[in-house]
Amino acid sequence: MHDLVIRNGLCFINGEFVECSVGVDGNRITHVAKEVERGEIEIDAAGCLVMPGCFNAHTHAAMTLLRGYAEGLPLREWLEKVWEVEARLDEDAVYWGTMLACVEMLKSGVTAFADMYIHMDAVAEAVGESGMRAVLGYGMADRGDEERARKELEIGLEFAEKWNGGFEGRVTTMLAPHAPYTCSPEFLKVVSDASKDKGFLKHIHVSETLWEVKEVRERYGKRPVEFLDSIGFLDSSTVLAHAVWLSEAEMKILAERGVSVAHCPTSNLKLSSGIAKVSELLEMGVNVGIGTDGAASNNMLSVLSDARVGALLQNLRGRTLKPGHWLEMATEGGYRAYNLKGGRIEEGYLADIVVFSKTCRNAPMHDPAAMLYVENQALHAVVDGVLVMEDGILVNVEEEKVIEKAEETALELVGG
């Protein structure tokens, strides 16, 4: 008998949807077939879509507190407004903001996310309580100050070492310097060395705007990716957020170094940043995941919604990709970027699985993959082999309480 069985669903496997059942034991998928033996827990998925959970490859979860704040501004002006409010954040605020994000993500089919922010102990606690999976790092920026650099690295390393493997392995950690324009070359080198010494991943914002490209070129005489490569920062343990404004030479560097990209199409549109060359990156062999960025720069944390926006933008560029490719980026692309064996309905993979029902919004299903773009409220969610949402109701979290506490916190934060 299996620990858990998802039975008779239409399962997303190798880019297509096929009828099958999924057996889970411990935190792994152990059996994928038309017929599997009974499970201690049985989920009837007849008429439903079953797919690996989505991985939000770049976000700042607690920024749900700033959803709808500083609307209508380009990135630099938006950052100035947001940083002013973020300076008032404390552990309690970040906890409730992250809990709200976890509720939203689970209900939209996201089982795991990568987060770089502040007060990260609170983020880790929220992840643990919600039942989600996450890769977490303290967002570091030295701004050319040696003393600040020392303190930032100390905080980042302390957090990474404390929480790596937390909550039975659902939390893993990384080092997360903010960007080439907020971190000095010396600091980035130290972070890169620490990453190699300790075995931590690295995550950084890169080439989000043309302003950033211009700023880095003026400082260092190189484009951002070329600059990072020149100091030895780029390798297969590196994930770049955004990567909108890349030259062909830079894309080749990413492919050669095994760097992954977290594509954030909605955020890039909202902040007037630009449209990333996703099709070209994939053609060159670069692994791409999909991120929402924070709710303040997106308004939602639905990876499937971002996949839809990303697909439409590449269509606009004349570089169309099939819906199945976008689902692969939304799932396995993120897990692969962060060195996790997940994002596939396949034996031996992490049992992070979501189930979507058929509704008036996604019927008829001529192409189930395309229909997931428009119907992205999950019915059931399994993370690490554990049922964390059943019939749309979260198992570990009081949703109404989280919404109430997050709203109270947000109003206090912005002085409402």
From Swiss-Prot:
Its EC number is 3.5.4.28, 3.5.4.31. CDD domains: ATZ_TRZ_like (cd01298). Gene3D superfamilies: Metal-dependent hydrolases, Urease, subunit C, domain 1. The keyword Zinc applies. Substrate binds at residues 86, 178, 208, 293. InterPro entries: Amidohydro-rel, Deaminase_MtaD/DadD, Metal-dep_hydrolase_composite, Metal_Hydrolase, MTA/SAH_deaminase. It is an enzyme of class 3 (hydrolase). It catalyses: S-adenosyl-L-homocysteine + H2O + H(+) = S-inosyl-L-homocysteine + NH4(+); S-methyl-5'-thioadenosine + H2O + H(+) = S-methyl-5'-thioinosine + NH4(+). The keyword Metal-binding applies. Pfam families: Amidohydro_1. Catalyzes the deamination of 5-methylthioadenosine and S-adenosyl-L-homocysteine into 5-methylthioinosine and S-inosyl-L-homocysteine, respectively. Is also able to deaminate adenosine. Belongs to the metallo-dependent hydrolases superfamily. MTA/SAH deaminase family. This is 5-methylthioadenosine/S-adenosylhomocysteine deaminase 2.
